Structures are given as structure tokens and as C-alpha cells.
Design a protein with these regions (language model features):
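A beta-rich soluble binding module of mature secreted/lumenal proteins
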Residues: 1-167
Length: 167
């Protein structure tokens, strides 16, 4: 399926999506997430962009690592497809909400072309809690397999329970 043909969450409500999400699973190929207890916190800015704060605990250093960026819809008519930018020199990253119920789970997909030679696909299963029920995890993997072709064995369970609380 071509990247532009991937169905996204219909009637996406960005305000309901705001708040804290915990990473439950991620693609194995994501090199910049090496910590535990990974979280994403989204807040709506006055200009309708989204402040993105990603945090992960680094157990070897016993510190929280964080990065902040800004997300905006690629197209106002398709608010579930966002572009996220963390560094001014870096092109924005692709962020597509394939599915969310806003209160429990979010299935997020990203695709990027590398030098127009090949595409890199990535996915995340996010939850409002750190450890989602198995039925929701299975539902998320089914969405990935049916819509993007990513299979369960291309994902890692995000390690949890090693970090001191920040809240």
C-alpha cells in the first residue's frame, strides 16, 4: 500500500488526544529510543500546533532524558497525519494516527524515504497506561499487519518499571 493510501483515524479530535501516552511497543529499527518507561506528552499550543515532550529513563545513568518538539497537521483536512520537528536543522518526522480510542490506546505509524532509495516504516503502540491489556495489544498488531504490513515480530516491548516517578 502506498504511503498516501494508508487509512488514518477518522474524525480525529486533537484535543481529546492531548495528554500523556506511554510507549508499550515500538519498532525494532528505532535507534533513538534506548531507555525504559518511555512517555510522550502532548499539549495544544495557542497557535494550534502541538508541543511534544518525549521522555525516557536511562537506567545506566539513572537520569531522565527528554526532548521537546512541535507537531502540526500535514493538511488541516487530515488532522491525524502530523509532522513532528525536534531540531531546526532536521526535516520533520512523519506521525500518523491509524487508530485511537483516546482513553486507552493509540496506534501510530511513520514512513520516511531515505535518499529516495528505500522507505523506512516504523510503528508505536501507545497507551494511557504503561501496560495495556493483551486484547488491546493484539488489536493494535492486527491494525499494523492489515494496514501497513508491519508484523508483530518487527516490534519490541518497551521496558517499564525501572524509573523513579516524575509526577
Amino acid at each position: 500500500m502506498a504511503a498516501n493510501d494508508i487509512p488514518l483515524q477518522e474524525n480525529f479530535d486533537v484535543k481529546k488526544y492531548m495528554g500523556k501516552w506511554f510507549e508499550n511497543y515500538r519498532s525494532k529499527e528505532i535507534p533513538f529510543e534506548s531507555g525504559t518507561d518511555i512517555q510522550a506528552i502532548y499539549t495544544l499550543n495557542p497557535d494550534n500546533t502541538i508541543n511534544v515532550t518525549n521522555r525516557q529513563y536511562m537506567p545506566d545513568k539513572k537520569v531522565w532524558d527528554r526532548i521537546e518538539g512541535t507537531a502540526r497537521p500535514l493538511n488541516p483536512n487530515q488532522p491525524a497525519h502530523l509532522l513532528v520537528k525536534f531540531f531546526s536543522w532536521q526535516p520533520p518526522g512523519d506521525y500518523r494516527v491509524l487508530y485511537t480510542d483516546y482513553t486507552n490506546i493509540s496506534v501510530v505509524y511513520s514512513e520516511a524515504s531515505v535518499l529516495d532509495l528505500f522507505d523506512v516504516k516504523a510503528g508505536w503502540i501507545l497507551g494511557r497506561q504503561q501496560n495495556l491489556p493483551q486484547v488491546q495489544i493484539d488489536q493494535a498488531f492486527e491494525i499494523f499487519e492489515n494496514i501497513t504490513g508491519l508484523s508483530r515480530d518487527e516490534f519490541l516491548k518497551t521496558p517499564t518499571g525501572k524509573a523513579p516517578s516524575l509526577d
